[in-house]
């Protein structure tokens, strides 16, 4: 369900401070964050943000198409390992 328009987009304060600090510096180092709930703003375009997926930080390069989406949408938390194979041993028919 989308957020109400009268509330506006959400971003964690600590993440916003990290982004502003990174934009002032010349080196474009990756920003580590655990805030998957934060919305991507236009001033984040061009930055690499490492988003925590519960186990590790996944680096994501922010593009213009990502603006308005949440950071958590680009860091998958679940791994699908496929269905297990049938372990019944087939006996040869005599």
Swiss-Prot record:
GO cellular component, one term: small ribosomal subunit
PROSITE patterns named among the record's database cross-references: RIBOSOMAL_S19 (PS00323)
Keyword Ribosomal protein: yes
Domain of life: Bacteria
Gene Ontology biological-process annotations: ribosomal small subunit assembly; translation
GO MF entry, a single one: structural constituent of ribosome
Record key words, sorted: Ribonucleoprotein, Ribosomal protein, RNA-binding, rRNA-binding
Pfam families hit by this protein: Ribosomal_S19 (PF00203)
PANTHER family named in the record: RIBOSOMAL PROTEIN S19P FAMILY MEMBER, SMALL RIBOSOMAL SUBUNIT PROTEIN US19M
Function per UniProt: Protein S19 forms a complex with S13 that binds strongly to the 16S ribosomal RNA.
NCBIfam families, alphabetized: rpsS_bact (TIGR01050)
UniProt similarity note: Belongs to the universal ribosomal protein uS19 family.
Protein name: Small ribosomal subunit protein uS19
Organism of provenance: Buchnera aphidicola subsp. Cinara cedri (strain Cc)
GN (gene name): rpsS
